[in-house]
């Protein structure tokens, strides 16, 4: 029996009334994963034994009636550490790495009796926008298996969209939650930088990385964020949680809300059908009582260039720790210490990871630092200032999540620049440390279109308010791919 069409609140009521047990729900989730996994390849590891053991322990002590997520299974992106469960970052380099600790976000969820069901596939070390750079093979889009699911949190998005799990965690460095959420027609939130601890997240770009949430609905997304958000002494960049309940404004109307629509977000390079869908969504917000006005974010056009200098520079530093000495893969054909380093990194990293390490090393090198890295930091400040000017007069920014719908597998992965441009609309949010959400807003060419809502720092409850108002008066979130029902 499958429970994948039940809401979290419905599942909670079933668990509290003992109509089902946490063990039965966990086994049903494992069955849902197995029934769909061959088609979508969303998981690197299904932690069947550990999940069932955790569920049995929860059943033994009893479901907490006051804890909505008690006994609920969830999936975790494979770059987020899980105690005793393989955490590979979808790389040969960490093919056998089993952490002895949980990331703070995972520990927070487990403390609320949530059950880790498995680790989801992703672009290697979170470097990619299509889900195709994984050592474990490409994840497929839940709606059309010939299309990419987006990246880098490809498996976390596809798992929710295909009905394998109801909730999952991902990470977002330049759009890695919002873009796959858009491509798969689900809800994905990147919180304000520092809202969720990065302790236990395998680092890519430390000034950009943020753990976030995937779900079927806006309210469930906020409910999961309530659990994982926390200040953490183990992460010096974490911030006090300023919102007691991220669901607090859900259900409130948005009359009088001022929403900005940047002209740059609907300009050159945006698919005409995507543009039309977003303009229709803007009109819908106006019908709900909001004011939508065109604004300009003039420096957003430099976002991709700035991001790939800063993120690659940080990655080249962060990935120095993977050397074949301490953990993970080690090349066997080494004659000396230098050979171990060179051969291990040459054989252990995929092409995209190597490309970004080389780009970052070049940007930080003597003679080029001022021209590239320093200049990128200065332009990053201009991008931040653009947002600050808009948010002085507006509550939120609206636009498409991605320039297009999901594209064909094995097309852009041979053209790095074209692939990088797919993150054009999400990258500025990371550069500024802002919260952003993608919600389903319609379809183009039979594939989901994502609407992105961006707010000032620590405005997640307002973002959820507007997103929920849109969701409550449309039915895009109710439409599911064929595979969700088990047929393929």
Swiss-Prot record:
Record-linked SUPFAM superfamilies: Amidase signature (AS) enzymes (SSF75304)
Domain of life: Bacteria
Residue numbers annotated as active site: 77 (charge relay system), 152 (charge relay system), 176 (acyl-ester intermediate)
Catalysis: reaction(s): L-glutamyl-tRNA(Gln) + L-glutamine + ATP + H2O = L-glutaminyl-tRNA(Gln) + L-glutamate + ADP + phosphate + H(+)
Lineage: Bacteria, Bacillati, Bacillota, Bacilli, Lactobacillales
Origin species: Streptococcus thermophilus (strain ATCC BAA-491 / LMD-9)
Subunit note: Heterotrimer of A, B and C subunits.
Residue stretches in coiled coil: none
GO-annotated biological processes: translation
EC number of the protein: 6.3.5.7
PANTHER family: GLUTAMYL-TRNA(GLN) AMIDOTRANSFERASE SUBUNIT A, TRANSAMIDASE
Record key words, sorted: ATP-binding, Ligase, Nucleotide-binding, Protein biosynthesis
Enzyme class (EC, first level): ligase
One Gene Ontology MF term: ATP binding
Recorded GO CC terms: glutamyl-tRNA(Gln) amidotransferase complex
Protein name: Glutamyl-tRNA(Gln) amidotransferase subunit A
């Amino acid at each position: 029996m499958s429970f994948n069409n039940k809401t979290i609140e419905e599942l909670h009521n079933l668990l509290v009334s003992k109509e089902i047990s946490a063990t039965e729900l966990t086994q049903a989730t494992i069955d849902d994963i197995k029934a769909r996994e061959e088609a979508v390849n969303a998981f690197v590891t299904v932690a069947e034994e550990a999940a069932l053991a955790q569920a049995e322990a929860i059943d033994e002590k009893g479901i907490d009636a006051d804890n909505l997520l008690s006994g609920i299974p969830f999936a975790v992106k494979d770059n987020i550490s899980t105690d005793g469960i393989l955490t590979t970052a979808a790389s040969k380099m960490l093919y056998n790495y089993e952490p002895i600790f949980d990331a703070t976000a995972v520990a927070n969820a487990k403390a609320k009796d949530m059950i880790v069901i498995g680790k989801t596939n992703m672009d290697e070390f979170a470097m990619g926008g299509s889900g195709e750079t994984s050592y474990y093979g490409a994840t497929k889009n839940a709606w059309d298996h010939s299309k990419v699911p987006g990246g880098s949190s490809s498996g976390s998005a596809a798992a929710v969209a295909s009905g394998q799990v109801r909730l999952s965690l991902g990470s977002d460095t330049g759009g890695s939650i919002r873009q796959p959420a858009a491509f798969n027609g689900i809800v994905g939130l990147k919180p304000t930088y520092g809202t969720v601890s990065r302790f236990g997240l395998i680092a890519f770009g430390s000034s950009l990385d943020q753990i976030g949430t995937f779900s079927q609905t806006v309210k469930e997304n906020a409910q999961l964020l309530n659990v994982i958000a926390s200040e953490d002494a183990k992460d010096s960049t974490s911030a006090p949680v300023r919102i007691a309940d991220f669901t607090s404004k859900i259900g409130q109307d948005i009359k009088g809300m001022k929403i900005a629509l940047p002209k740059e977000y609907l300009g050159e390079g945006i698919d005409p059908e995507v543009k039309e869908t977003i303009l229709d969504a803007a009109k819908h917000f106006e019908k709900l009582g909001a004011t939508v006005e065109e604004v300009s974010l003039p420096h957003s056009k430099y976002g991709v260039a700035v991001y790939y200098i800063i993120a690659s520079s940080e990655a080249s530093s962060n990935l120095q720790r993977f050397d074949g000495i301490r953990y993970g893969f080690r090349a066997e054909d080494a004659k000396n210490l230098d050979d171990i380093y060179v051969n291990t990194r040459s054989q252990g990293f995929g092409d995209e990871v190597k490309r970004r390490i080389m780009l970052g090393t070049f940007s930080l090198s003597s003679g080029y630092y001022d021209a590239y890295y320093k200049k990128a930091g200065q332009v990053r400040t201009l991008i931040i200032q653009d947002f600050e000017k808009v948010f002085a007069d507006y509550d939120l920014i609206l636009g498409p999540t991605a320039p297009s719908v999901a594209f064909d597998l094995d097309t852009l992965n041979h053209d790095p620049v074209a692939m990088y441009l797919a993150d054009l609309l999400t990258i500025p949010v990371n550069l500024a440390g802002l919260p952003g959400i993608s919600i389903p807003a319609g379809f183009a060419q039979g594939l989901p279109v994502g609407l992105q809502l961006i707010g000032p720092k620590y405005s997640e409850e307002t973002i959820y308010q507007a997103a929920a108002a849109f969701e409550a008066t449309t039915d895009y979130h109710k439409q599911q791919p064929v595979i969700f029902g088990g047929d393929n």
